[in-house]
Amino acid sequence: MATGRSFAEFVKNKCYNGLYRAAENYVDSDWRSLNLYTRHVHRIGEVELVDVNIQRVYVHDLPGMRVGFDVGLELEIEVKEGDYHYDESDTCFPWIRISCEGDLSCGLDDWEITSIAPYNQKNPPLNSLSDALVPYIPFDRLEDEAAAFLKEFYPEALKVTPYGQKPVSVEPDILVKRLGLQTMTRRVREDGSVYGQLYFVDTDAEMFDAKTGTVAKQHIPGRTIVVDPQTVLLRTIGCANNTIVHECVHWVKHRKVFELEKLYNENASCISCEVVGGAASAVAEQATEMMERQANQLAPRIQMPAVSYTHLTLP
């Protein structure tokens, strides 16, 4: 799966006409709120929107496949003289902020505007997702993110057990079922360089057939984590478990990245986990590094949450 598509570019192509109409209506009714500055016009009479330019797109996470996005729109406004003693005109370039929401699963066909206001460049909207829709997770929030993950999908793992009793283990098979996923064992590559792959949609994927020594297409249902058996044979069962939890993190945290990719490439199907810790595809480096780093950091914290294990190290 090629990741790293630009949500801002998609918004520019998808929403431009609607944003233009909204800006036009706003200028007609609320241009005074823009505090237009002009050196030539003594008293503003008529104003007319000439053009708009999308300068910023800030995106934040919403439940499900919905996203909120704030568009910083630069307006080109022609200002005409309102004092009949003069015949001057000028052009102003104020910004407005148009707040929107939409559902990625329908390609933002349902997108709607929730508010419009003058843009405050000193206090821009905050991004909770990157332009590729990868969530921003600061290092000091990793434990909190892992705890929130478990609270939703495996709350018993957060239980602090009495002294002398082992904490509740996160069983990958149970976690997979709770997420509505399934696992499948297949040789992904001959050299065993791919630990696992998460398939979001049904696809005919190329897998290595150990019996024939060739690569052949096999049908993989959507919502499936494929784990290479070499992960266990050449390493440990713990490595296989970590791979499954790693892919579960991708499912919960990075589905929006996949949905955005699908809007550009309808053949996209999976995210892969390589031995080297990256994604096995031609990808945008920054987005891929963010996703893999997050999955690598969160997977062990989900399997050994701080709240359940810290007391084991205390004297």
Predicted segments, located by residue:
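Post-HEXXH active-site segment of zinc metalloproteases
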Residues: 254-286
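A short, surface-exposed helix-loop junction/capping segment
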Residues: 138-162
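N-terminal low-structure segments adjacent to metalloprotease catalytic domains
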Residues: 1-143
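Conserved small/polar residues in nucleotide/adenosyl-binding loops
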Residues: 310-315
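Zn2+-dependent metallopeptidase catalytic core
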Residues: 168-182
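Active-site scaffold of zinc-dependent metalloenzymes
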Residues: 189-243, 254-255
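A short mid-domain helix/strand-loop element embedded in enzyme catalytic domains
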Residues: 217-226, 266-276, 303-306
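An active-site-proximal "capping" alpha-helix that borders the catalytic cofactor pocket
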Residues: 288-304
